[in-house]
Amino acid sequence: MKPLNILISNDDGVFAAGIRALAKSAQKRGHKVKVVCPDQERSATGHGLTLQSPLRVEKADELFGQGIEAWGCSGTPADCVKLALSELLDHKPDLVLSGINHGPNLGTDIFCSGTVAAAMEGTLENVPSMAISVASFKWKNFEFAGEIAMNIAEQAINDSWPASLLLNLNIPPCEKNKIKELSWTRLSVRKYKNQFSKREDPRGDDYYWLAGEVVLDLKSKGYGPKNWPSDVSQIQENKISLTPVEPDLFWRGNLDDLPKIDNSFVNPS
């Protein structure tokens, strides 16, 4: 295929090993790569934007090697892609990639994910976009994940990937010869307990750490093929999960299933 102009971002920050591996994987295939990502870790920032302070950027080419132009940005992952598309890039990219994330982005957790939010910014601007994660916080071998991501991205681009469709890729944390297959998946609904750990500082004041533990993964009842496996079950079986996600969150159920709202209060007589 002809070389693509690719924008890469993440939420783990400019010094993360995952984003460097992804950038190198894309560059090795002859693509033109530019990186705009947070200047420090900003995981779980969701789709937050910086409105109360200016955004600052610094060149970071030396972290990625020859031929890759890179910036570290003071903002969130969504800020990074928005700024790149509006100001930093000379031309609209052919593809936006976000990752490789150090840890999973599965099920309803994607609403908190800076990785997915960065990719979603590309989707909202009608650029084919994919979020990429390795489903372990301890896994360090990102080279194979980069190869998988580029294989999928190139195939999707060649097959008329709808720009309004975000692809969320999760790769199991195991060696290449132990990965079984790739499947389209549905989002799980993830439930947590003990979401906050209460502590006391030396002055006797309370503070809290967010420390939730997953206790239940439910299959979504939402729109889509009912025979698809959930993304969580796919990863648990050492299979690659690829989930199509749209920015349209509109509910598609029956009108009769909605709460009955008496609108007489709007213009009371």
Curated annotation (Swiss-Prot):
Chain ranges passing through the membrane: none
Record note on cofactor: Binds 1 divalent metal cation per subunit.
Top enzyme class: hydrolase
The reaction(s) this protein catalyses: a ribonucleoside 5'-phosphate + H2O = a ribonucleoside + phosphate
Location of this chain's protein in the cell: Cytoplasm
GO molecular function: 3'-nucleotidase activity; 5'-nucleotidase activity; exopolyphosphatase activity; metal ion binding; nucleotide binding
Cofactor entry: a divalent metal cation
EC number(s) from the headed UniProt entry: 3.1.3.5
Primary residence: cytoplasm
GO cellular component: cytoplasm
Keyword Phosphoprotein: no
Binding residues annotated for a divalent metal cation, in chain numbering: D11, D12, S43, N101
InterPro entries: SurE (IPR030048), SurE-like_Pase/nucleotidase (IPR002828), SurE-like_sf (IPR036523)
Entry keywords, A to Z: Cytoplasm, Hydrolase, Metal-binding, Nucleotide-binding
SUPFAM superfamilies: SurE-like
Family, similarity comment: Belongs to the SurE nucleotidase family.
PANTHER family, alphabetized: 5'-NUCLEOTIDASE SURE, 5'_3'-NUCLEOTIDASE SURE
Function as written in the Swiss-Prot or TrEMBL entry: Nucleotidase that shows phosphatase activity on nucleoside 5'-monophosphates.
Protein name: 5'-nucleotidase SurE
